[in-house]
């Protein structure tokens, strides 16, 4: 089980996201993270093992500006509870960040194919495989993001 919160608006996204994650704490989780797009259009990801309060402490001296963001609390299904396995996950270029709830049944096969193409993985989660697959389709076929996501979702057995 996980909690997913997203925000696009005029206010700073970080406080909205943290408030949303705190409302979902009762569901149980082992890690928390946020991805924010700042005013310079940079994508920043901050994540940690532990509670939302641990995430708040971790980012206390970091730039959490931006009016667009996603946030996630994770209950591990693939990979141990640790900072590397916490969501959101970056693509190799760090241009995409993804959070996900569910299980990608054929993630190991997809991961192996992507590794043979030079992709490097920093976690043992199925979600990181999905964000790398999206980027692979986007870059190798010169596709827009929506089409790359659609192709990536066709190439998996099960996203629940």
Please identify what each model-predicted range represents.
Residues 1-160:
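Conserved short alpha-helical segments that host acidic/polar catalytic motifs at enzyme active sites
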């Amino acid at each position: 089980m996980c909690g997913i919160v997203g925000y696009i608006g005029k206010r700073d996204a970080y406080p909205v996201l943290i408030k949303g994650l705190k409302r979902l704490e009762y569901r149980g989780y082992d890690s928390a993270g946020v991805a924010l797009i700042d005013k310079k259009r940079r994508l920043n990801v901050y994540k940690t093992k532990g509670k939302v309060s641990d995430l708040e402490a971790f980012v206390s001296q970091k730039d959490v500006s931006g009016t667009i963001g996603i946030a996630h609390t994770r209950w591990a299904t693939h990979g141990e509870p640790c900072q590397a396995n916490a969501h959101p996950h970056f693509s190799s270029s760090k241009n995409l960040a993804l959070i996900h709830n569910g299980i990608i049944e054929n993630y190991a096969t997809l991961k192996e194919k992507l590794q043979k193409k030079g992709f490097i993985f920093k976690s043992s989660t199925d979600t990181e495989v999905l964000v790398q697959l999206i980027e692979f389709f986007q870059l190798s076929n010169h596709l827009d993001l929506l089409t790359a996501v659609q192709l990536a979702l066709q190439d998996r057995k099960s996203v629940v």
